[in-house]
Design a protein with these regions (language model features):
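Conserved SGNH/GDSL esterase-like catalytic core that processes O-acyl groups on lipids
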Residues: 66-248, 271, 276, 282, ...
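Bacterial Sec-dependent N-terminal signal peptides
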Residues: 14-46, 515-535
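Catalytic nucleophile-elbow at a beta strand-turn-alpha helix junction centered on a G-D-S/GDSL motif
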Residues: 48-64
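Acidic, Ser/Thr/Gly/Pro-rich low-complexity segments that form flexible
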Residues: 273-449, 453-483, 496
Length: 535
């Protein structure tokens, strides 16, 4: 994979000052784009009515939230725009969110619906220092809680974010909103036309469409990886279960409507998104991160490492841990960049062993206390992943009164901020297994009516060719303005990126059905927005 890892947020934007003269002093409406006016044909397909179902990409989530601009440039909407040139309808109804900023969650007060609620993210640039940052626009909780005001029975796009595949198969996705109903999704409930009696998939099937796009399972994998593989928050996707769900969904769709045709998508190589590639595993600089740090601090860390490593060697010699694990846990600090200290739940918990050594008089209590943060710790290996969310934790003291106890250096990052090599392997096996189930379902039930847009390796291929041009416009695989194809959350594309994704689906449609649907003109869509100037 092309190396597009970056250490600090400022690194990716060093060119802003020389390539972008524009300054923004407040949040402004996004510009509109012009669309091409080509012509095409539908081949053996019928695009008269197009319906879609899927997760956050299909719904148009962008900058961490579902908002007007993102929804207006969803993958579903951009495909519909192009189908209109090949016999498709000129209208495509989505459950308008009616919010410029959308809603991510409560702000620092932790209370939803208050003045510090957080909406979409955007880039900022300090007027005094030029430093680049990311901030939140004011959140709009009511955009999620307010029912869609249009005709719910006329919708074309049944996609909704913050979902898992099982939600699409149950009417309980529409309610009730009670703790005993984990299937409830407020983004679906606001446009549920059935009063929680028909599943999202059932309503999608009942739309009477002649052509469909289905992208299911994507969000299950995205949610797990985004939370660092912390199974206490999101379990690793069970590929066998998800594959069964998809087979049931596709079989039901095709049986219920024996004439419609469509396209399905596989789960992309999500770990190639900037959210998972932005922070290098070797960013810890103790003498810069720890306040008042100096050569003496580094010497203390090196002394701690020497003692820790020697202790592990002894434990391996006594058979309490393997020599391989002792090697994995070797700590090393030096001047400059060092590997991040992380928590690895697969390691042996050394706490009880150290307690036993204290009881035997072989380890003093002070040393035991100093070692406690390292009982399941090691330093990250090359190729392991720190999600972008770790940026706000690395180098932060555990408590203000403990300035030298900082995450990533002297205290391991919690599991939610790190994907181990084992977790990455499990993730990829599950993703590939699920994608094989998608292909198997199409082979078993498709009957020549279903195309597959295979996104395996797609993001990595874009990263490997970045920068590239479209319509004489430069496109880069990042969220750096003005050329980037990713939104500021690093995990959802922006309008330009969604156009690239839409074109992948369009290519599959053309290939399967002998159609000539024109591709979206990627260069005509907005890339990453310029930063807002702040004091």
């Amino acid at each position: 994979m092309k190396n597009f890892k970056y250490i600090l947020l400022t690194t990716i934007f060093t060119f802003i000052g020389i390539s972008c003269e524009q300054e923004m002093t407040e949040l402004s409406p996004f510009p509109s784009e012009g669309y091409s006016s080509p012509s095409g044909s539908s081949g053996s397909a019928n695009f008269a009515k197009f319906a879609t179902i899927g997760g956050s990409y299909t719904a148009g989530m962008m900058d961490g939230a579902l908002h007007n601009f993102g929804q207006g440039h969803s993958v579903a909407k951009l495909i519909a725009n192009q189908l209109a040139y090949a016999g498709g309808a000129s209208t495509f109804y989505q459950p308008d969110i009616n919010s410029a900023n959308g809603y991510i969650g409560p702000g620092p007060d932790g209370i939803p619906g208050t003045s510090d609620d957080q909406g979409r993210t955007y880039l900022t640039q300090s007027a005094s220092t030029g430093a680049i940052g990311i901030d939140f626009a004011p959140g709009d909780l009511m955009s999620v809680l307010t029912p869609y005001g249009g005709d719910k029975t006329a919708l074309n796009n049944f996609a909704f974010p913050n979902s898992v595949l099982a939600m699409y198969l149950t009417p309980f996705a529409g309610g009730p909103n009670v703790p005993a109903n984990p299937a409830y999704n407020p983004f679906f409930a606001r446009f549920d036309a059935s009063g929680a009696t028909v599943s999202p998939l059932g309503q999608f099937i009942g739309s009477g469409a002649s052509f469909f796009m289905t992208w299911l399972g994507h969000s299950d994998f995205l949610g797990y990886a985004a939370r660092g593989g912390d199974q206490a928050q999101v379990p690793i996707p069970d590929a066998a279960t998800l594959g069964g769900y998809f087979q049931s969904a596709l079989g039901g769709m095709l049986a219920a409507n024996p004439v419609w045709k469509g396209v399905v998508g596989t789960v992309p190589d999500l770990l190639a998104a900037p959210y998972f590639q932005f922070i290098a595993a070797t960013v810890a600089k103790p003498t810069e991160i720890i306040p008042m740090a100096n050569d003496a601090t580094l010497a203390q860390l090196q002394g701690l490492a020497a003692g820790f490593n020697a202790l592990n060697t002894s434990l391996a010699g006594l058979g309490y841990i393997t020599a391989q694990e002792a090697g994995m846990r070797t700590l090393s600090w030096s001047v400059g960049a060092n590997s991040i200290l992380v928590e690895d739940e697969t390691l042996t918990d050394l706490g009880p062993l150290w307690d036993a050594l204290v009881g035997l008089g072989l380890l003093d209590a002070g040393t035991r206390a100093a070692l406690d943060p390292f009982k399941m710790a090691r330093q990250a290996f090359d190729g392991e992943i720190l999600p972008l969310s770790a940026q706000v934790v690395i180098g932060v003291p555990v408590h203000p009164s403990m300035p030298t106890a900082v995450y990533g250096v002297t205290v391991p990052l919690p599991d939610q901020y790190f994907l181990t090599g084992a977790e990455l392997y499990e993730f990829e096996v599950a993703r590939q297994t699920y994608n094989a189930a998608v292909a198997g379902a199409v082979a078993a039930y498709g009957g020549g009516r279903v195309a597959i847009a295979d996104f395996n390796g797609y993001f990595e291929s874009l990263a490997g060719t970045s920068p590239f041009t479209n319509n004489n416009v430069v496109v880069t695989y990042d969220f750096a303005p003005p050329t980037g194809m990713w939104s500021t959350d690093g995990i959802h594309p922006n309008a330009r990126g969604y156009a690239l994704v839409a074109n992948k689906f369009i290519a599959a449609i053309n290939d399967k059905f002998g159609a000539s649907v024109p591709s979206a003109m990627v260069g005509s869509y907005t890339g990453a927005a310029l930063p807002v100037t702040v004091n």
